[in-house]
From Swiss-Prot:
Alphabetical GO biological process terms: glutathione metabolic process; hydrogen sulfide metabolic process
General function of this protein: Could play a role in cell adherence or biofilm development.
Key word Chaperone present: no
NCBIfam families assigned: bifunc_ST_SDO, TIGR01244 family sulfur transferase
Gene name per UniProt: blh
Family: Belongs to the metallo-beta-lactamase superfamily.
Keyword Zinc: yes
Pfam families reported for this sequence: BLH_phosphatase, Lactamase_B
Protein name, as recorded: Beta-lactamase hydrolase-like protein
PANTHER family linked to this entry: PERSULFIDE DIOXYGENASE ETHE1, PERSULFIDE DIOXYGENASE ETHE1, MITOCHONDRIAL
Amino acid sequence: MKAVRINERLTIAGQPMIADFPSLSAQGFKSIINARPDGEEPGQPGNTQEKSAAGAAGMDYGFIPVSGPTITEADIRAFQQKMAEAEGPVFAHCKGGTRALTLYVLGEALDGRIQRSDIEDFGKTHGFDLCAATRWLERQSAAVPHIKAFFDPRTWSVQYVVSDPATGGCAIIDPVYDFDEKSGATGTMNADAILDYVKRHGLSVEWILDTHPHADHFSAADYLKQKTGAKTAIGAKVTGVQKLWQEKYNWSDFKTDGSQWDQLFEAGDRFSIGSLEARVLFSPGHTLASVTYVVGNAAFVHDTLFMPDSGTARADFPGGSAKQLWASIQDILALPDDTRLFTGHDYQPGGRAPKWESTVGEQTRSNPHLAGMTEEDFVRLREARDRTLPMPKLILHALQVNIRGGRLPEPEANGKHYLKFPLDVLEGSTW
């Protein structure tokens, strides 16, 4: 095992064996970062064994699996976070060390602590070829639009600020309004973090976009509209969702015309974010109103495709359809192979760090719900999987807010807001 000390906080290495972990702890390492996907070669210990061995040796452990071409800023920031959390020296590895060092160096470059022109020499000094790191930075600087993700670990949701570097115009996609179902408390921590980012970067919010009425969190669209004055928008088929849930909530006087938003997008509609053109794909299946927003070389695919190691979204909500979901996914996969895809949720399989960015090509090659699958195969798999899933714990809480455009129910005489729960209207009980 080749191990190279980069500085007093970080050592980069090739694959250690499980028997090495007690020795690493004895040498003073406090944390292990495994940057290697499972199954790369026979005999590789893998995430589960490494996590167990690290814990037994008294070390923290982080799993940030990457291959060179698929490194994203989420991986880089996750590496930095594990470094910051470590209570002492960190031992980071992949198969040979290059990917682990690449994650470190890219973080240093993004934060201005190393110049792009110095990266390859830095690598040579330590015995590594970091040409791929400089190429990554070149691609990243050329990518339009600029995208900043905000991950909410309470709901596994990913929110986005999508900005035009030429004008500073931006859109906010799928923002979360905080809600604690145990206490009934609401908050704006997620939305305020987005507003802080917008302010620090001198951006102007032009749109607040929801991809569909969410069943697992409240939308912060109305709160952000009040703070920014930006227009709110969603797919036009939201009126069908409103009618469906109007009946379930027994709201005879509820408006089901979509007037809670400033704009209802039809399939194929185009709009501007700064000087960038955005267009709308109709993407039903998860819900009957879901849409995808395509901006430059990026598509915001919400609850259709998850990361390639996580498959696809469920299609068993009222108005959902596995067959429609397959068709919607095929429309997304018809985009160019290098189109960046940004998902709406990440459930961190294997305990890995959260991720949200892939490409059309990666999904086609690596997603087990898609690679080598026919429509019939997919529908069979998706429906069988959905039969095992309980309803989301917030579905009855969230939809009565989200079909109102993110507005809480009107306060009652005492000034308090109240949610309404219909009983026995959904299948999927957990007993």
